[in-house]
């Protein structure tokens, strides 16, 4: 179940209220007179379920067949001049749409919760200059919570974060003599003087019973 399934969902003509409203805003509020139409599609990437579960979810959780058109993997190529823009939540930003879909799919099949990533794809039909396209992007992307999404499907939705490097410990610090402490001051270019470093040494030796990390020394030194 390592496959990523992708689908695009768009309201059928007569139900595309959001697209019609957005067209009016972009054309009249932003003055994009070259804009001739707007399409709004929801894009879903799903990982962690098998093909049978996905097939059931695509028409029960991800779309409503009565009012939605749905395409698997790729959306129909837009005709004529157009600008394509995909927008997704920033990493770490709560995405209610994706989370709700993941919960519903989990309840539907009774297994582990899948990973769902959602994005909104805008098709801006008509001829837009580079400046007008940038204006539309600025209007559609709130940088506090969203960003422009890649158009290609990822191989996986898993996000691997690098393991932070271990914080170095100043081994033997609490046993250093005066010359050793002077060496620490020079090696790490510390701003504190010898008396301050000796006080820090006594604290870690007598109160903490251990050698400090370099980070702890840097914090005291600032």
Q: What name fits each language-model region?
A:
Residues 1-222:
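Core nucleic-acid recognition elements
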């Amino acid at each position: 179940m390592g496959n990523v399934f992708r689908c695009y969902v768009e309201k059928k003509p007569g139900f595309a209220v959001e697209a019609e409203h957005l067209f009016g805003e972009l054309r009249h509020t932003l003055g994009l007179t070259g804009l001739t139409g707007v399409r709004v599609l929801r894009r879903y990437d799903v990982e962690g379920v098998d093909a049978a579960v996905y097939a059931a979810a695509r028409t029960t959780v991800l779309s409503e067949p009565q009012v939605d058109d749905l395409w698997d993997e790729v959306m129909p190529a837009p005709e004529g001049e157009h600008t394509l823009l995909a927008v997704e939540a920033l990493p770490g930003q709560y995405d209610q749409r994706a989370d709700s879909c993941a919960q519903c799919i989990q309840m539907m099949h009774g297994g582990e919760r899948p990973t769902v990533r959602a994005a909104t794809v805008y098709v801006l039909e008509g001829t837009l200059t580079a400046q007008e396209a940038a204006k539309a992007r600025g209007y559609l992307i709130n940088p506090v919570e969203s960003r422009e999404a890649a158009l290609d499907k990822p191989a996986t939705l898993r996000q691997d974060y690098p393991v932070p490097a271990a914080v170095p410990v100043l081994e033997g610090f609490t046993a250093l003599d005066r010359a050793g402490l002077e060496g620490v001051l020079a090696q790490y270019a510390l701003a504190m003087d010898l008396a301050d470093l000796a006080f820090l040494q006594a604290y870690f030796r007598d109160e903490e019973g251990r050698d400090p990390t370099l980070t702890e020394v840097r914090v005291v030194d600032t």
